[in-house]
Amino acid sequence: MTGQHLSTDCNLVLFDLDGTLVDSAPDLAGTANDLRAAHGLPALSYDALRPMVGSGARGMVGVAFGVAPGDAGFEALRDAFLDRYAQRLLAHTRVFEAVVPLLDKLDAVGLRWGIVTNKAMRFTAPIVAGLGLAARAATVVGGDTTAKSKPHPMPLLEAARQAGVEPSHCIYVGDDLRDVQAGHAAGMSALVAAWGYLGLGEPIEAWGADAILREPNQLLHWLQLT
């Protein structure tokens, strides 16, 4: 674990979803390759697709078809991607194996936790429910729950409001630079989940996080629960 600060004043742990709590890459990568096949294109390797999972449909369509928002055909490809993804949300998506005991420990000590993701609630809600997380989470905020999404702090502030916890008593754990940016903008400690997707930008050591967690159980040490 990188980062020396230890939190003894945390009343709510907020997690990103994709790449932090759950491994959704197999279903998102599979959707991208299904759409490529529909356009007569060969499959891309899983390793080529996985880093962009955290960027959602925009990132997946971008790497699969080499297009960006504003390019001709982007919106049609994005909509087709989302339609296909909606049919396989839980085909292979699972809670990361090492995250399971982490959540169990948080529950056992009575430290509440929640989810803040840029994924739209029409996808987030069935995934969270299907994986048995909905009844356990103190709050679930999706990408369309508030007027702005991460890196804006609004979703994190809404999660804190729903849980009745001051932002300064929350921490946020995510696997993307925008997670660190959003957490700090909300007045929270921000930690990197280094087991996640991480994108293809600057190295995580340059993100300015309060700590880099190499594996989920390191969060327990950071919280002084071990």
Feature locations, PLM:
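Active-site neighborhood of HAD-like aspartate-dependent phosphohydrolases
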Residues: T2-P51
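Short, acidic loop-to-helix structural element flanking the phosphoryl-transfer center
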Residues: D9, Q87-I115, M121-A125, P153
